[in-house]
Swiss-Prot record:
Cofactor requirement: Ca(2+)
SMART domains with a match to the protein in the record: C2
GO annotations of cellular component type: plasma membrane; postsynapse; transport vesicle membrane
Record family assignment: Belongs to the synaptotagmin family.
Biased composition (Low complexity): 183-205, 229-244
Residues that bind Ca(2+) 4: 459, 465, 519, 521
Protein's recorded name: Synaptotagmin-3
BP-aspect Gene Ontology terms: cell differentiation; exocytosis; regulation of postsynaptic membrane neurotransmitter receptor levels
InterPro entries, A to Z: C2_dom, C2_domain_sf, Synaptotagmin
Subunit structure: Homodimer; disulfide-linked via the cysteine motif. Can also form heterodimers with SYT6, SYT9 and SYT10.
Single GO MF descriptor: metal ion binding
Vesicular side: 1-54
Residues the record lists as binding Ca(2+) 3: 387, 390, 393
């Protein structure tokens, strides 16, 4: 289009020039000149893009101005209005507080400050003499009729709990200060024993008024400055009944406050448990076998019933009380294993209960045992403390005989037995069933992993994720290794998987197998549950017998059960030789 426009312009210019040259004085000259000027102006029009650019620029400038104005207003409000408001609010709220401190120095401002009364929400706590109210809902587990006070052994008192120092009423705090204990929100003082400060006196004052400023000055001078390094743990029944010698440690004298009516009453809410301050073993765990053998370690409740139609002994584990603390935090992670003596073929295990000394299990198990054999059988309970990174600690055990007589008791009356401290019990890691088959002509050794039973629980859920790894060993060195699949959340996995190794006939007398059951962890390192070893130079006689039977019966699978042991128990694969380390077994 630009070419046509220029041609038209040139053509009209030529016509105009010719007209001007031909008729200089013609009247149409002015009209021609006007037409040429209009055509020239039309050739250079003002584009619409310029108008759009100006409009867009004006919109952007306006928006930026509005944003800057908003930011400046917000900054001014934060710098000027908020500090002024806070200053004014504190001045208004601080006036009455100082006014209250003048005549009586209120404890709300002395202890915690802030303009609110301490313990207003717990004014009716039973420890403070007010109306009783429940702090939590009672737990009603399944088979609750077996836990009623009518059962054998009676009901057990509930475990007391601690209250936060900030939740005590002013009268309680006054009694604490009067008893020589300095209140604190972070680490409250532990009370002393007996009449020399054995507990905190949570009693209301005989007079209804607040203490004076002079009394507060005297109380401040009586407050001790020493503190214990940690908060006390929750109390148990055993702790509440423990009495210490008051002459062993000096305590500031207690100032008991009388109740209205002339009677004095003290509530014990904290007490030192001496066994918690004994020396700890490796890893911060306290030794559980230093005490006298057979000493009681709490109590366990259960119920028995025999089903004559199906020849089953039903065992229901209900709860345990007053277990000893095996962890450095003052608690344990208990679980119970049960099995029938003397064969121990079938074992059961409860779930692990975290951080408790009074676990409630309510789990039922069944043993298949004929009625004729029940009189010769004994039921064995083993209470363990779960430990994720080391060997589980044996808390205690109970051996029960006369099963038929006990099973005939009414089912609504549970049985209570004392848990006796056990000695050094052999680690029960489980058993592994596999077969060996050797083909001399093909030089092939086939290891068929069939199943495992009663494996050690390695996870907090009370289960493991086991797989089996077999390693071909020669002179303490690993030549080859094979693995099975992983079985999730089980202690009795079934595999039925074959692991094949190439072994020349001339070398079969110089090699052996190290078979490890490993717990798989998606995060972290896999952990070895237990190992067993077979071969001509195996330390276990059962492993040597299995290998010899395989060589004596070529082309036939020879199946055996093997007891799993800890890696450190079998320090070497051969007699006097060098074995695989735990790291090599877990790889």
């Amino acid at each position: 289009m630009s070419g046509d426009y220029e041609d038209d312009l040139c053509r009209r210019a030529l016509i105009l020039v010719s007209d001007l040259c031909a008729r200089v004085r013609d009247a149409d000259t002015n009209d021609r000149c006007q037409e040429f000027n209009e055509l020239r102006i039309r050739g250079y029009p003002r584009g619409p893009d310029a108008d759009i650019s100006v409009s867009l620029l004006s919109v952007i400038v306006t928006f930026c101005g509005i944003v800057l104005l908003g930011v400046s207003l917000f900054v001014s409000w934060k710098l000027c209005w908020v500090p002024w408001r806070d200053k004014g609010g504190s001045a208004v709220g601080g006036g009455p507080l100082r006014k209250d401190l003048a005549p009586g120095v209120g404890l709300a401002g002395l202890v915690g400050g802030g303009g609110h009364h301490l313990g207003a929400s717990l004014g009716g706590h039973p420890l403070l003499g007010g109306p009783h109210h429940h702090g939590h809902t009672a737990h009603h587990p399944p088979f609750a009729e077996l836990l009623e006070p009518g059962g054998l052994g009676g009901s057990e008192p509930p475990e007391p709990s601690y209250l936060d120092m900030d939740s005590y009423p002013e009268a309680a705090v006054a009694s604490v200060v009067a008893a020589g204990v300095k209140p604190s929100q972070t680490s409250p003082e532990l009370p002393s024993e007996g009449g020399t400060g054995s507990g905190l006196l949570l009693l209301p004052p005989s007079g209804g008024g607040l203490p004076s400023a002079q009394s507060h000055q005297q109380v401040t001078s009586l407050a001790p400055t020493t503190r214990y390094p940690a908060l006390p743990r929750p109390l148990t029944q055993q702790t509440l009944t423990t009495q210490a010698d008051p002459s062993t440690e000096e305590r500031p004298p207690a100032l008991p406050l009388p109740l209205p009516g002339g009677e004095e009453k003290a509530k014990l809410i904290g007490q030192i448990k001496p066994e918690l301050y004994q020396g700890t073993g490796p890893g911060g765990r306290r030794g559980g076998g230093s005490g006298e053998a057979g000493a009681p370690c709490g109590r366990i409740s259960f119920a028995l019933r025999y089903l004559y139609g199906s020849d089953h002994l039903v065992v229901r584990i209900l709860q345990a009380l007053d277990l000893p603390a095996k962890d450095s935090n003052g608690f344990s992670d208990p679980y119970v294993k049960i099995y029938l003596l003397p064969d121990r073929k079938k074992k059961f295990q409860t779930k692990v209960h975290r951080k408790t000394l009074n676990p409630i299990f309510n789990e039922t198990f069944q043993f298949s045992v004929p009625l004729a054999e029940l009189a010769q059988r004994k039921l064995h309970f083993s209470v363990y403390d779960f430990d994720r990174f080391s060997r589980h600690d044996l808390i205690g055990q109970v051996v029960l005989d006369n099963l038929l007589e006990l099973a005939e008791q009414p089912p609504d009356r549970p049985l209570w037995r004392d848990i006796l401290e056990g000695g050094s019990e052999k680690a029960d890691l489980g058993e592994l069933n596999f077969s060996l088959c050797y083909l001399p002509t093909a030089g092939r050794l086939t290891v068929t992993i069939i199943k495992a039973s009663n494996l050690k629980a390695m996870d907090l859920t009370g289960f493991s994720d086991p797989y089996v790894k077999a390693s071909l060993i020669s002179e303490g060195r690993r030549l080859k290794k094979r693995k099975t699949s992983i079985k999730k959340n089980t202690l009795n996995p079934t595999y039925n998987e074959a692991l094949v190794f190439d072994v020349a006939p001339e070398s079969v007398e110089n090699v052996g197998l190290s078979i490890a059951v490993v717990d798989y962890d998606c995060i972290g390192h896999n952990e070895v549950i237990g190992v067993c070893r077979v071969g001509p130079e195996a330390a276990d006689p059962h492993g040597r017998e299995h290998w010899a039977e395989m060589l004596a019966n070529p082309r036939k699978p020879v199946e055996h059960w093997h007891q799993l042991v800890e890696e450190k128990t079998l320090s070497s694969f051969t007699k006097g030789g060098k074995g695989l380390s735990e790291k090599e077994n877990s790889e």
